[in-house]
Amino acid sequence: MSDERYQQRQQRVKEKVDARVAQAQDERGIIIVFTGNGKGKTTAAFGTATRAVGHGKKVGVVQFIKGTWPNGERNLLEPHGVEFQVMATGFTWDTQNRESDTAACREVWQHAKRMLADSSLDMVLLDELTYMVAYDYLPLEEVVQALNERPHQQTVIITGRGCHRDILELADTVSELRPVKHAFDAGVKAQIGIDY
């Protein structure tokens, strides 16, 4: 490709991008969903949260399912004022106790609702929330109501497989991660600093 053709192509791209940027005038918080069966939902969410903290934004995190074991995200972000609330039972496939899992979910959900009502929080990350709805630990209607009633400027990030269609419809941005290849399938153990 000649330099002239390259410049012309890039100019067309610039015009399209500039037109889209000019159309985007609404300033408000958004709902972002990272879903699908591929790796990287939590990683993408925490990358966005880290970016927000780097710009001086106030962020709160609620982790469903993952338990209280240490993880790199928490080690990095808590010293920067990010509040973490974690479902105490951990992986529900380990506990296999619906009653205690539901109670633990409801307890940490109270913190999530508090954060979703807190106008001082610029962002709330609800890691693995989709499972709580899918497993009927939380009523969908209650989750949707809390999302709808949050402060206007607050952004919410939701992660997890199998996101309910009502939450997908409510979301402004949805990314579905698709598995192509995963080291775990080849027998490679989850690695500190990579997977948690």
From Swiss-Prot:
Its EC number is 2.5.1.17. It comes from the Bacteria. Keywords: ATP-binding, Cobalamin biosynthesis, Cytoplasm, Nucleotide-binding, Porphyrin biosynthesis, Transferase. It is found in: Cytoplasm. GO terms for biological process: aerobic cobalamin biosynthetic process; cobalamin biosynthetic process; porphyrin-containing compound biosynthetic process. The lineage of its organism: Bacteria, Pseudomonadati, Pseudomonadota, Gammaproteobacteria, Enterobacterales. This is Corrinoid adenosyltransferase. The keyword Transferase applies. ATP binds at G36, N37, G38, K39, G40, K41, T42. Belongs to the Cob(I)alamin adenosyltransferase family. The keyword Cytoplasm applies. GO terms for cellular component: cytoplasm. It comes from Escherichia coli (strain K12). Its main location: cytoplasm. InterPro entries: CblAdoTrfase_CobA, Co_AT_N_dom, P-loop_NTPase. It catalyses: 2 cob(II)yrinate a,c diamide + reduced [electron-transfer flavoprotein] + 2 ATP = 2 adenosylcob(III)yrinate a,c-diamide + 2 triphosphate + oxidized [electron-transfer flavoprotein] + 3 H(+); 2 cob(II)alamin + reduced [electron-transfer flavoprotein] + 2 ATP = 2 adenosylcob(III)alamin + 2 triphosphate + oxidized [electron-transfer flavoprotein] + 3 H(+). Required for both de novo synthesis of the corrin ring for the assimilation of exogenous corrinoids. Participates in the adenosylation of a variety of incomplete and complete corrinoids.
